[in-house]
Amino acid sequence: MLGQRKLLIAASGTGGHLFPALAVAQELPEYEIHWLGVRDRLENQLIPPHYPLHTVNFSGLQGKTPWAKLRPLWQFWGVFWQTRQLLKQGDFQGVFTTGGYIAAPAILAARSLGRVAILHESNALPGKVTRWLAPWCTLVALGTPASLAYLQSKRLNLRVTGTPVRPDILHPGNLELPIPKAVPLIVVMGGSQGAVAINRLVRATVHRWLEAGAWVVHLTGNHDLDAPTIQHPHYLVFPFFEPMGPLLHRADIAISRAGASTLAELTLTATPALLIPYPYAAEDHQTVNAEVLVRAGAAEMIPQSALTGDRLGQIILEWLGQPQKLQAMAENARQLAMPNSSQQVADLIRRLIPAP
């Protein structure tokens, strides 16, 4: 379309990067949007066909051996030049990225051409790419005010917007599961990639919750070898579940990792949560994310190393017997929610990339 604005979105790898980017894209129907991703990553399944997907071969910049560190550097410069060429040939006015290693070559390619580069950082502890490249960005949008403490610089153009979420989180329909309205519901989720350790802890104790009258929806991810081991009509097991909005709005308790997008969804659905941060996350950033909700009284956190099946079982049983506690946690979560994040980020993009 003549005069249509063109935007390249660079988001790859996990739901934490992809879902916020998709939420923003849906707020920009007047833009021609293309997607930059990595071969064989989750975006190849999630990105709708109306966003042309351009994939590159890139494995990030971390490595243990000298060769493992050198090879990604060669890949990085290859991706940089590919992205630069894509921006020029496609006449894109700018790049929007949600972080991760695909963000680095995308930001640098855009700025080398004098194009707009907008970065959204969801984590309370900004990732290395954000800390290194924020000064190069036209604007950095933040998922939480907690991130400001790590990005103190007069050179940075920062806005706290919250983390964009899938539309069904904000506008849930009916939950298409046969769960009675009056029973307590526990939802277990390990993020877009699942969590084998959480799966094992839950299966060691879930019978206690079922005996107490609760229903459990357990989202295991695709790498769950023990899925058939427990059979119970009130224990519903899925690798993933869509849409998540109705499920989280119905949940009384969530047991979850502490990815930034997941925590945004928990606040927007006012779901009390027991958080078990992924212990191998870069710079332990999930613990920093979880601490934001813990300080607000919206969640409790236990390190995976300190948790057993018995302890997990007892904590949840105690919560089930304390409805006032759960109600207070839900209200505290609601106070943290930022429901207009997608629109805020989209409006910032419109201001920086106006109609030609």
From Swiss-Prot:
This protein's record includes keyword Cell cycle: yes
Residues that hold UDP-N-acetyl-alpha-D-glucosamine according to the record: 14-16, 123, 166, 192, 286
Source domain of life: Bacteria
Membrane-topology annotation of the record: Peripheral membrane protein
UniProt key word Cell membrane: yes
GO cellular component, one term: plasma membrane
Major localisation: membrane
Pfam families: Glyco_tran_28_C (PF04101), Glyco_transf_28 (PF03033)
Metabolic or biological pathway, per its Swiss-Prot or TrEMBL entry: Cell wall biogenesis; peptidoglycan biosynthesis
GO MF annotation: an example: UDP-N-acetyl-D-glucosamine:N-acetylmuramoyl-L-alanyl-D-glutamyl-meso-2,6-diaminopimelyl-D-alanyl-D-alanine-diphosphoundecaprenol 4-beta-N-acetylglucosaminlytransferase activity
Keywords: Cell cycle, Cell division, Cell inner membrane, Cell membrane, Cell shape, Cell wall biogenesis/degradation, Glycosyltransferase, Membrane, Peptidoglycan synthesis, Transferase
Localization per record: Cell inner membrane
Catalytic activity entry: di-trans,octa-cis-undecaprenyl diphospho-N-acetyl-alpha-D-muramoyl-L-alanyl-D-glutamyl-meso-2,6-diaminopimeloyl-D-alanyl-D-alanine + UDP-N-acetyl-alpha-D-glucosamine = di-trans,octa-cis-undecaprenyl diphospho-[N-acetyl-alpha-D-glucosaminyl-(1->4)]-N-acetyl-alpha-D-muramoyl-L-alanyl-D-glutamyl-meso-2,6-diaminopimeloyl-D-alanyl-D-alanine + UDP + H(+)
EC number, UniProt record: 2.4.1.227
GO biological process: carbohydrate metabolic process; cell division; cell wall organization; lipid glycosylation; peptidoglycan biosynthetic process; regulation of cell shape
Gene3D superfamilies, A to Z: Glycogen Phosphorylase B
NCBIfam families named among the record's database cross-references: murG
Function: Cell wall formation. Catalyzes the transfer of a GlcNAc subunit on undecaprenyl-pyrophosphoryl-MurNAc-pentapeptide (lipid intermediate I) to form undecaprenyl-pyrophosphoryl-MurNAc-(pentapeptide)GlcNAc (lipid intermediate II).
PANTHER family per UniProt: GLYCOSYLTRANSFERASE, UDP-N-ACETYLGLUCOSAMINE--N-ACETYLMURAMYL-(PENTAPEPTIDE) PYROPHOSPHORYL-UNDECAPRENOL N-ACETYLGLUCOSAMINE TRANSFERASE 1
Family according to the record: Belongs to the glycosyltransferase 28 family. MurG subfamily.
Protein name: UDP-N-acetylglucosamine--N-acetylmuramyl-(pentapeptide) pyrophosphoryl-undecaprenol N-acetylglucosamine transferase
Organism field: Thermosynechococcus vestitus (strain NIES-2133 / IAM M-273 / BP-1)
Organismal lineage: Bacteria, Bacillati, Cyanobacteriota, Cyanophyceae, Acaryochloridales
